[in-house]
Amino acid sequence: MKELNKKEKEYLLNSIRAIKDFPKPGIVFRDITTLLNDKEAFNFLMDHLTARYENFGIDFIAGIESRGFIFGAALAARLRLPFVPIRKPKKLPYITISQKYSLEYGVDEVQIHIDAFGEKEDARVLLIDDLIATGGTAKASVELIDQTKAKCVEACFLIDLKELGGSGTLKKLTKIYSVLEI
């Protein structure tokens, strides 16, 4: 699988706006809307992900709410695969299963339709989101996929905030690919 070189990574990184002190002092928020507004950068990213995953043997792509929907649905369309949304509670209309996870000050959860991966036994799922920080949501999403008897074969992120340790935690459950590491 082709990896991006330093120049290609810099190109993508430069297409993402960094906003200091948002949502609170000391945080640098990575605003992907500028990448989405740049058709060349967005298509470059999607071409890269398509090349990486076109022969990966994936049955489904699952995206984490909400920015994982953008990249996941776009990649699923390119690969002609079904897309499965992993959502916050009470957003899905049919019967769901849930996985709780801890936040700094509380608990949250993610949900998926009970039949999200259809009748396929051991469905191979690619999980995708824009960013991994502490990894709580991604870990819960992998555990949620496991509850359905499907298998998360890899978790893909546009950005890995390495210093927050999420990828280190998540790699105990599945393989990880991050386009950019910050």
From Swiss-Prot:
**NCBIfam families linked to this entry:** apt, PRK02304.1-3, PRK02304.1-5
| Catalytic reaction(s) noted | AMP + diphosphate = 5-phospho-alpha-D-ribose 1-diphosphate + adenine
Subunit text? Homodimer.
Could you say which enzyme class this protein belongs to?
Answer: transferase
What family does this belong to? Belongs to the purine/pyrimidine phosphoribosyltransferase family.
Q: Which residues cross the membrane?
A: none
Report if keyword Amino-acid biosynthesis is assigned: no
Q: What is this protein called?
A: Adenine phosphoribosyltransferase
Pfam families from the UniProt entry: Pribosyltran
Supply the InterPro entries for this chain.
Answer: Ade_phspho_trans (IPR005764), Adenine_PRTase (IPR050120), PRibTrfase_dom (IPR000836), PRTase-like (IPR029057)
Task: Give the protein's biological function.
Answer: Catalyzes a salvage reaction resulting in the formation of AMP, that is energically less costly than de novo synthesis.
Tell me, what is one Gene Ontology molecular-function annotation carried by this entry?
A: adenine phosphoribosyltransferase activity
Q: Which organism is it from?
A: Campylobacter curvus (strain 525.92)
Keywords annotated in UniProt:
Cytoplasm, Glycosyltransferase, Purine salvage, Transferase
Question: Where found, per UniProt?
Answer: Cytoplasm
**Gene for this chain:** apt
Predominant location category: cytoplasm
EC nos: 2.4.2.7
- UniProt cross-references to SUPFAM superfamilies, sorted A to Z: PRTase-like
Q: List this protein's GO terms for biological process.
A: adenine salvage; AMP salvage; purine ribonucleoside salvage
The pathway it acts in is: Purine metabolism; AMP biosynthesis via salvage pathway; AMP from adenine: step 1/1
* Entry GO terms, CC: cytoplasm
Which PROSITE patterns does the record cross-reference, listed alphabetically? PUR_PYR_PR_TRANSFER (PS00103)
